[in-house]
Structure formats: C-alpha cells, structure tokens
Design a protein with these regions (language model features):
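Active-site pocket-lining segments that scaffold enzyme catalytic pockets across diverse folds
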Residues: 1-18
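Short, flexible loop segments at boundaries between secondary-structure elements
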Residues: 174-187
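Generic structural hydrophobic/aromatic packing signal, biased to beta-strands
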Residues: 10, 21-23, 86, 151
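Acidic-glycine-rich active-site phosphate/pyrophosphate-binding loop
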Residues: 19-38
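Short active-site oxyanion
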Residues: 17-20, 130-131
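Thiamine diphosphate
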Residues: 3-5, 34-175
C-alpha cells in the first residue's frame, strides 16, 4: 500500500470519528492536506519527531476529543521516549499511527533502522503500550482506526506528487485552535 492510500483512509476515518488529526512533517502533511484538508488537521511544518508528542499532549489536554497523530518511522525513531510516555499516560482518546516505509521519505529516502532490524511494534510493546497493532492492508488500517495505542502501518517507499500546503503556519494554528476550542462532536 502506498503511503498516500493509508493517509486517505486515516483522514476519512478521522473525519468520521470527528477526531483532531496531527500530521507528520514533510510529505505526509502535504499528502494529508491534498486528500482531506479540514480545520481539525494540524500540519507539522518544522519539528521532525514531534507529531506523536503533540498528539499525546492534545489528547491529555482535551480528553473529550478523539486525537489521532500520524508519524513516520524515522520521526518516531528520533523520539522513542514518546512511546514510554504514551504507555505511562495511556489515554483512551489517542491513537498514534506510525507509517513505516523504512526510510526518511521527506529528506531523500535514506534508510531507517526499520528497513533492517528495528521493529516499532515490538518497541512500543517493550515500552509498555497497552494496545499495539500492525497493518499492511487498507482493510486492516480501517478496522484498527477506532482503537487507542499504537498502529504501525507498513507502506511503500515513495512520495505522492502533491503540492505544498497552501496555508501559512499562522493560518494552520489559528484555525486548528479555533476548532479544538469548540466542543468535540462526541460531547
């Protein structure tokens, strides 16, 4: 499955759940913007490795909201501490989706450790995350999107040909803050 296909499924599921959605820096955010821009999406523009932490912080600060974060394997490898913090806090309203293509896709597709030996699902289990799933098909992604914890999605290497995000960082944060300040759809 291509990454943009997985992101399309995630975007549709997040929308149907009324969830806040945090997109990883670079091409994943660009692909998310292209397939399903909405005020409930927060696009990371300059902090590699922190989408998972920002998503977790949102879930803890806004417990009535469902929060989903999309991060890449390279980004999570740069911030493995987020898995232990996620395990420790264990919020029911948070799902971290790790798109694992075995490379740093936004910087030239240099291989990550997951292309060889590192297994992010096993790392999450080792950190104590209560629910960890691995998906490789569209059906598996769809069926696991209502869960909490960590979902590792195996995707192909490659960036979709999508334009840059047409919003400034100020516009992204202002509309996201305005949306997240409203009651969650599930309240």
């Amino acid at each position: 499955m291509k990454r943009i296909e997985a992101i399309s499924i995630i975007a549709r599921e997040a929308d149907s759940q009324g969830a806040l959605l945090v997109g990883n820096i670079g091409y994943p955010s660009r692909e998310l913007f292209a397939v399903g821009d909405r005020a409930s999406n927060f696009y990371m523009l300059g902090s590699m490795g922190l989408a998972s932490s920002i998503g977790l912080g949102l879930a803890l600060a806004l417990p009535k909201w469902r929060v989903i974060a999309i991060d890449g394997d390279g980004a999570v490898l740069m911030n493995l501490g987020t898995l232990a913090t996620l395990a420790d806090q264990d919020p029911d309203n948070y799902l971290l989706v790790i798109l694992d293509n075995g490379c740093y896709g936004s910087t030239g597709s240099q291989p990550t450790c997951t292309s060889r030996r590192a297994d992010l699902a096993k790392l999450a289990v080792g950190a104590g995350v209560s629910e960890v799933k691995v998906a490789a098909t569209a059906g598996e992604v769809r069926s696991d999107m209502a869960k909490k914890g960590v979902l590792v999605v195996k995707v192909e290497i490659g960036n979709a040909d999508v334009p840059v995000i047409e919003l400034s960082s100020e516009e992204i944060i202002e509309r996201f803050m305005a949306r997240s300040a409203q009651p969650s759809p599930s309240s």
